[in-house]
């Protein structure tokens, strides 16, 4: 396994908007992943609002924030956008990001965010 085929993934969280009572938690401080492997990044949340949206962003070393995917609380199916998909489980209050066939360009800080 060469170093060039490893990805470094770091997770963080943020929230958007005034909100009623919300909390976002990402428990994985960082990980190394073999290129072409699938990666799952955990995000759990707590909110008292029945209507909300969950977002995932990535921030590569260049610094810009890049929007990846959105899931609305009333959406019937898990969101999918290219190699990115969400494993959204409303009852468990989780919205885990799945990156299929990881690439070196996926090395970044990842942010889970919520808007009520």
From Swiss-Prot:
Swiss-Prot/TrEMBL GO biological process terms: adaptive immune response; immune response
Instruction: Report disulfide bridges, numbered on this chain.
Output: 43-112
Determine if Disulfide bond is one of this entry's keywords: yes
Glycosylation site residues = 78
Tell me the domain of life. Eukaryota
For this protein, the record's PROSITE patterns field holds: IG_LIKE
Primary location class: membrane
Self-association state and partner proteins as the record states: Alpha-beta TR is a heterodimer composed of an alpha and beta chain; disulfide-linked. The alpha-beta TR is associated with the transmembrane signaling CD3 coreceptor proteins to form the TR-CD3 (TcR or TCR). The assembly of alpha-beta TR heterodimers with CD3 occurs in the endoplasmic reticulum where a single alpha-beta TR heterodimer associates with one CD3D-CD3E heterodimer, one CD3G-CD3E heterodimer and one CD247 homodimer forming a stable octameric structure. CD3D-CD3E and CD3G-CD3E heterodimers preferentially associate with TR alpha and TR beta chains, respectively.
Q: What is this protein called?
A: T cell receptor alpha variable 14/delta variable 4
Its ancestry begins with: Eukaryota, Metazoa, Chordata, Craniata, Vertebrata
